[in-house]
């Protein structure tokens, strides 16, 4: 943060995106991270964690719909039990609860203060999802929860902060962690994770794909443009192949499974999001790294 007026968000060690800030609603250094709620001049209300924009009112729906719906629509059966790790704004939870079949949505976040801020300032994100009777909110470390849970899930959604070295999410992008997730999935289940930016950290994006494919065998990658992130943003899915869904299948499953409106995701945006451009696809052939606990991948910024 540069004073109270500008956020200088470092995308790489040698470039940043400057955001003009109109107002600061709340700011606190929690035991886990530095959390700030602001009003951006261009993007409206927004959440910043450790100097990185997490989401803004302008385009959060694009991120959250592409994170959730390709996974849940590609499951062979409509999901009943869904686990969310992270996603403190409540918007991922909001999208999961649009599924008529969902009986229980467990959301695990390490930082109670983020949830508190979201409930107070980010209604446009959660839209009451925290109070839904199907919601189970757990405040704990994600890895601790995974190690201790006795339940199994139809889908696991990882809406985590970037794998910045020594951050709270640093080790939640490794082969060993994904193996733990595989162990608590029901048969036919799948996972998705936000996978950083093909624009600024292409090697990380591809390595996350490689790591998930190593564990789940079936994997696919999507991307979209996020104006508030100043570039492309990526997602990786494991255990299922949403990229193989036809446009007709996407449309029919939206009608069958979802109650409520979608603002971004439809058959056409699905097709475009999984149509990786040639220059990005070529990197999947060149980069072979798999992220492990001994040699984890991380965003350099």
Swiss-Prot record:
The keyword Cytoplasm applies. Residues 4-240 form the PABS domain. One of its GO terms (molecular function) is thermospermine synthase activity. GO terms for cellular component: cytoplasm. The keyword Transferase applies. It is found in: Cytoplasm. InterPro entries: PABS, PABS_CS, SAM-dependent_MTases_sf, Spermi_synthase, Spermidine_synt_N, Spermidine_synt_N_sf. One of its GO terms (biological process) is spermidine biosynthetic process. Keywords: Cytoplasm, Polyamine biosynthesis, Spermidine biosynthesis, Transferase. It holds the Pfam family Spermine_synth. The active site is at residue 159. It comes from the Archaea. Pathway: Amine and polyamine biosynthesis; spermidine biosynthesis; spermidine from putrescine: step 1/1. Spermidine binds at residues 64, 89. It catalyses: S-adenosyl 3-(methylsulfanyl)propylamine + putrescine = S-methyl-5'-thioadenosine + spermidine + H(+). It is an enzyme of class 2 (transferase). CDD domains: AdoMet_MTases. HAMAP family: Spermidine_synth. Belongs to the spermidine/spermine synthase family. Catalyzes the irreversible transfer of a propylamine group from the amino donor S-adenosylmethioninamine (decarboxy-AdoMet) to putrescine (1,4-diaminobutane) to yield spermidine. Homodimer or homotetramer. This is Polyamine aminopropyltransferase. The lineage of its organism: Archaea, Thermoproteota, Thermoprotei, Sulfolobales, Sulfolobaceae.
